[in-house]
């Protein structure tokens, strides 16, 4: 990489955007390295903290560090619906559904028209037994035109609720592995 010396902020942004491109191109190890480099140059950049922390938690890796990073991002940007969604989703992924609901409801207040946040809140509602509200959120997520690959998943949740096959919870996936004798 040939980037100008002494311009940490600009270089951090460059690594951050390249990391996003790599992550979306399914090149996770390169993306992770670039996100870490971006943080090295700007340790408190909330978008980088959020993106890397969310990515780790969504993959079920580095959960403690990912959660700390997202909390730092929320402290800096408490009114950013996407960052608050990340915190709610992090709680969901570790099985803390009550805190997930609280944060995801806040994220919806901030970004009501985002299909992913509505989908996340639907999942959290389902986990705390608020099934009618869950189906409403999923229907709303569907109507907000989610990414094409997400639409069949959302429609399956509307029809069947959360099942082991469509669950996004690390805790639920760990339980399934334990039940299947594959982990524990």
Where are the model-predicted features located?
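Residue-level detector of the short coil/turn that links helix A to helix B
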Residues: 26, 60-61, 95, 129
């Amino acid at each position: 990489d040939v980037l100008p010396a002494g311009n940490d902020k600009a270089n951090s942004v460059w690594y951050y955007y390249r990391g996003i491109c790599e992550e979306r191109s399914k090149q996770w190890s390169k993306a992770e390295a670039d996100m870490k480099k971006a943080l090295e140059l700007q340790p408190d950049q909330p978008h980088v903290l959020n993106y890397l922390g969310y990515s780790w938690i969504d993959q079920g890796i580095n959960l403690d560090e990912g959660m700390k990073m997202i909390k730092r991002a929320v402290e800096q940007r408490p009114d950013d619906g996407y960052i608050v969604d990340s915190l709610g989703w992090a709680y969901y992924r570790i099985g803390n559904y009550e805190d997930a609901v609280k944060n995801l409801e806040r994220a919806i207040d901030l970004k009501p028209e985002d299909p992913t946040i509505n989908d996340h809140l639907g999942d959290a509602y389902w986990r705390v037994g608020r099934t009618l509200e869950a189906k409403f959120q999923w229907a709303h997520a569907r109507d907000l035109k989610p990414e094409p690959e997400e639409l069949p998943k959302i429609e399956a949740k509307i029809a069947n609720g959360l099942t082991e096959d469509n669950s996004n919870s690390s805790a639920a996936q760990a339980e399934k592995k334990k039940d299947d004798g594959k982990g524990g």
